[in-house]
Structures are given as structure tokens and as C-alpha cells.
Amino acid sequence: MDSLDQKVFELLARPQRQEELRRQLPGVGKQALADCIQRLTASGKIVKNKKNRLAQAAHYGYIAGTFLATERGFAFVAPDEKDDKGDIFIPPHADGGAWQGDHVLVRLGEDGRRRDGTPRREGEVARILERSRAEILGAVRQRGKSFVLEPSSKKYPSEIVLPKAHLGGAQPGDKVAVRMMYYGEGRVLPQAAVVQVFGKNGTMQASIAAILHENGIQEAFPEDAQQQAGSLGDRVPADAYAGRRDLRDELIFTIDGDSAKDFDDAVSLKPLANGRVQLGVHIADVSHYVTPDSPLDAEAYRRGTSVYYPGHVVPMLPFALSDGLCSLVPGEDRLAFAAFLEIGPDGRCHKAEFAKSVIRSKARMTYNNVNKILDGDAELCKKYDFLVDTARKMADLADLLRRRRMERGALDLDIPEAEIAVDEQGEPVDVFYRPRGRAEKMIEEFMLQANEAVAQFMDTHNHPAVYRVHENPDPEKLRVFAQFARPFGHRIDPSKPQDTRQLQAVLDQAAGDPRQRALPTLLLRSLARAR
């Protein structure tokens, strides 16, 4: 809100007429005040009652928020101003014609009750403040001589009319995205225009394209970002080596999944004269190529992350970088940033050092092959004889680090992850649990150690940083979990959420018992989300 809007809003903490309000705002013109009131009313911040008295919406029992439809008829409204009372329940037929994502004004009624007996706010939509601009996905169907959209989600009306002039080339059976033109009233059906055609409904190609579109994920990069990426070439420039630690002769290698295409981290391990070892965690130095406020930086910021789905990836950076200069492929010079951790026989990190470097990976290893090497596979041990001893020492070090971490009260949920296998056409052919052997756990452990060392460094040197924090479990959620676990012989004290050892004891005892397979997942849902 601007200064006038804020001032008027504050004055309307008590009801008053517009004329009374003007007297408290000398120097503010009649039209300026009228415009201000219009803005505040349109946004749902203030309301006028039948006696023409204006007041903050909450004073008259109104709350503005976002309409969240469900597929079961009822809905919720997420208030603009968050509080500890949660979302507002909207019963069926009290939605006031609102659709998913609309900004609405809710008139609160008497509190209702949740299934567990706790109170919840209920209300009805009094006014639609602003329609959502979100597009709707669905399939084109023909009804006689007319065409309709059959939305993919039941959160929307079952049919939306598609005028022939607004089909956008779509044919019956196509998966499309539409933009609403008219929301309907009485017996008149809503109407929309097709803005994107993805292909035949039900095909893998159309389904994936629709999901990416719905979530604002764009595969193609802007021209300026592509030009910047192309100008970098495919080799590390000669002037980039200066001031970097040269690690090209050291035994550094990557370990990733079988289907991985970009390799952005690598590891190394070497003994020190003082009886300790130096663990090296090396990540691609992307910042050397993606400079602040450049086209690549702006596009990476907009995307936020790479998006992976079975058999494909939509990268945060163009493939020239993600699969090229910033991928630690074997035998090629690559710019990196290294964390060197000096670890003693007791598993304690005595020293951490960080440096920009240039590396040359000696091998592209997979979790599968490293696990086989650790199990003594003769053929692979012979093929990779130059790193077998190092891999075994790495695995032993990871076991030591994990034991020390567990002694500090860490939780090892070890929840299996499903993986979807696809064929060459991208069609799913199998679903299986992703294996998690010693190699997978080893890399997890090393990354945890590196991140902990970086966090410690930032904190010690008072550098501003964003920390990932896990708070203690909620005692009430822990109580529910304790009740579920009790029939299996587990005893948990919900009043001691900070005592993670009692939770790890449950996980240890449940491991390998098919009857208790759900316990790790239920415990995960009882924990506070990282923030």
C-alpha cells in the first residue's frame, strides 16, 4: 500500500463515513480520497456496510484471500494475512461463483468443527475481487456441432464452451490449455479460448508438455542467454587458470546415477602425514561463467532449478554449460570450487579449507559400479584398479562419519524412492525402488560434511547466509505417531521431541519388518519441515 492507502486503512480501524474520514485528512482532495477508497475496497481490505460506514474488512467479519477449490465440491480460502487459525472452509454452494485461484472476499459465519473436533473457521464468498489469470488444461470434446473443454481437474466445471472462432487449430481429442473469456451465469455456460495445443490427449508427449506449461517451465532459452552460452566455447579459456589451485593430476572422480548426463560434483581422498585424511568435495564453478546480471544469470534466476522427469531434464542453464563447461566429464579441464576437509581417525573434522581450482576428472563412475567394486567384483576392480583402494577407503570413511553423526542425534529415515524407467520413446516401462547402497550413502555423507563445513565457516566469519533449519517435531504430531507405533512395541515420549534417539530406535527396530514399513514415512510427516 502507498502512504495514503496505509493512512486511510489505519483510520478505518473504527467504522466511519467518507465525510468523517475526509475531515481527518486535510490536504487530501475529494477525488484522491475516493480513488484510495476504491483501491482498498477492490483489494478487499475495507468494506462498506448498509449504513454507508467504512471499516477494515475484519471489523465487519470479512477476510480477503485466495480461493482453493477441491474435487469434492467444498473449498478453502487462504487468507492474504496469514494467522494461526488456518484456511477458511467454504461449504458447497457457498462459493459465490468463484473458481480456483480467484481472489475473493469471504464473509465469516459461525465456526464449524473438523473431524478431530477442533474448531475451524467457515464462511461464504461474498464477492470475487479478481479472477485468476491461470490457464486451464483439458481435452477438447465435440458435442454435436459444438466444442467444449473437459477440464483435467475436477476443481473446474465439467464442461467449458469453446467457440469455433477460438479453437486455435485444436481438434477433438487434443490436450489443450485455455484462457477464460466468460465465467457463465445462470444457465449460460462459461466460455474459453484455446491458447496452446499439446497434442493428442493421453499421449506421453502431450501430458509432459502440458505439465511443463501448467507450471511455467519453459524448455527453450531466450536468444540473449543462448548467445552468451554459445560465446563461451567448449574449452576452459587460458586466462581462467590464473589464481586457481591446480588439481589436474590428483585422483578426482565423479559418482552419479546410471542415467545422469551432467556431472556437477566430484570427490577425492588422500592420506596426510599427521595420520588424518583429506576429503575433497569438488563442485563445478558455475559462477565463473554465469556473471551477475548477465542474460544467463537472469534466466537461471527465473527458472530457479533444473527440472527432472523420467528420461529428460529441463536444465537451469543451457546444455552448452550444464552438459559442457560446467559438467565434470573425465579427461577434460574444468573449473571447480573445492572444499578440503581434514578428518581424524575419530571422524571429527579438524580443519576446513576452500579454494577455487582446476580439475580433470579421472573417471565417470556410477553408483551401481562403485557398489559392485565395494562388493569385490573382479572385472570392475581390474578395469578401475587405479581407484579401487581409494573407493574402499572412502566407503569406510563415510561409515565412520555416519556413525559419528548418528551419535549426535541424527535421524536415518532411509525411505525408498520410486524410479520410473522409460523406453527410447519416453514411454514408461517399469517402476522400481531406487537402490541405496554404500556408494549412494557415501556421496550423501560427503555432501553433508561439506555443507556443514561451509555453514560453520559462514557462521564463524559472520558472513550473511541462508541456513536450512530443522526444528524439533511438533509434540501433538509426535503424540499421534506414538499412538500408531505403540502396537508394534515402540514407546515414545511425545513431551521430549528433542530426543531424536528414541525416534531412531523406532527406525532401527522397524527396519526389515514388512509390517512396520509405513513407520518411517509416518515419522517423516510428523517432523517439522526444513525452512
At which residue positions do the language-model features occur?
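Electropositive polyanion-binding surfaces
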Residues: R23, A177, Y182-G184, K200, ...
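Charge-lined substrate channels and their catalytic hotspots, especially those that engage the 3′ end
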Residues: M1-G280, S287-D333, K372
